[in-house]
């Protein structure tokens, strides 16, 4: 099984000075012996590989930002740093994000810090923020080693906001104007009524006024009084009247 490995450092000579790639993943390498303790991080089958200079890609740190790597290209990334690497964390975050994108799911990153670099905790924190998991730290041959893995799942892309947010208008905070004074509690509308009661009373009066010529009698006894009127007689409740009189219903 062939694995693609990317080595990132100041220059190729320094990379091979720090790490002998011909034995980096060899079964009998002393470095590999330390890495074999991290079975949950590294592929066990990788330890059986014998690598030469042609078996890995090299790239300087500055070239990582210039070269557009295709996502999920490499199975392993080895990053060799100097004593000033990751002083604040923000200086290393863009580089770690690029390397995270270059790794395949379950791909491994190995960060090598010189013993004079005191920022291993900052590096581990930035690796965690970038998305690496199962981070492990150990020291070997006067170098500090940080090993992590890119998870085989993608971070959630769905927004945590459900639905749409209602935009509140400033008018909602302005109290409503007081209603016009009403005369509904009074026995009759005011002379200068402005609440609408006077208009309603006049309208109701017009609708309830009916000319006596309008209604017709089916029995012809309406003028005699309620005792002679039908149940649905329009004149019920009115006094008797002479036949032919004009009666106004209100």
From Swiss-Prot:
GO molecular function: 2 iron, 2 sulfur cluster binding; 4 iron, 4 sulfur cluster binding; electron transfer activity; metal ion binding
Pfam families: CIAPIN1 (PF05093)
Positions contributing to [2Fe-2S] cluster binding: 183, 190, 193, 195
Motif (Cx2C motif 1): 219-222
Sequence motif Cx2C motif 2, location on chain: 230-233
Binding residue positions for [4Fe-4S] cluster: 219, 222, 230, 233
Linker, as annotated region: 154-180
Segments of this protein annotated with the region Fe-S binding site B: 219-233
Highest taxon, organism lineage: Eukaryota
Cofactor: [2Fe-2S] cluster; [4Fe-4S] cluster
Region (N-terminal SAM-like domain): 1-154
Chain positions covered by the region annotation Fe-S binding site A: 183-195
GO biological process: iron-sulfur cluster assembly
Subcellular location(s) of the protein: Cytoplasm; Mitochondrion intermembrane space
HAMAP family attached to this UniProt entry: Anamorsin (MF_03115)
Family in the record: Belongs to the anamorsin family.
Reported function: Component of the cytosolic iron-sulfur (Fe-S) protein assembly (CIA) machinery. Required for the maturation of extramitochondrial Fe-S proteins. Part of an electron transfer chain functioning in an early step of cytosolic Fe-S biogenesis, facilitating the de novo assembly of a [4Fe-4S] cluster on the cytosolic Fe-S scaffold complex. Electrons are transferred from NADPH via a FAD- and FMN-containing diflavin oxidoreductase.
Quaternary organization: Monomer.
Stated name of the protein: Anamorsin homolog
């Amino acid at each position: 099984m062939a694995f693609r490995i990317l080595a990132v450092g100041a220059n190729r000579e320094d990379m091979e000075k720090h790490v002998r790639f011909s034995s980096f993943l060899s079964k009998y390498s002393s470095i590999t012996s330390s890495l074999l303790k991290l079975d949950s991080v590294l592929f066990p089958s990788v330890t059986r590989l014998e690598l030469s200079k042609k078996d890995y890609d090299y790239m300087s740190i500055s070239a990582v930002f210039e070269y557009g790597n295709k996502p999920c290209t490499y199975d392993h990334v080895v990053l060799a740093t100097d004593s000033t690497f990751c002083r604040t964390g923000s200086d290393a975050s863009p580089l770690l994000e690029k390397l995270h994108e270059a790794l395949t799911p379950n791909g491994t990153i190995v960060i090598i810090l010189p013993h004079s670099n005191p920022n291993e905790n900052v590096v581990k924190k930035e690796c965690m923020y970038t998305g690496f998991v199962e981070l492990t730290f150990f020291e070997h041959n006067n170098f500090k080693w940080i090993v992590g893995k890119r998870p085989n799942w993608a971070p959630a892309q769905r927004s945590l906001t459900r639905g749409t947010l209602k935009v509140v208008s400033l008018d909602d905070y302005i109290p409503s104007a007081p209603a016009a004074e009403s005369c509904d509690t009074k026995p009759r509308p005011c002379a200068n009524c402005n609440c609408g009661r006077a208009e309603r009373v006049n309208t109701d009066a017009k609708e309830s006024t009916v000319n006596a010529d309008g209604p017709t009698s089916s029995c012809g006894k309406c003028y005699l009084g309620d005792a002679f009127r039908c149940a649905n007689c329009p004149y019920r409740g009115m006094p008797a009247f002479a036949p032919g009189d004009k009666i106004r219903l209100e």
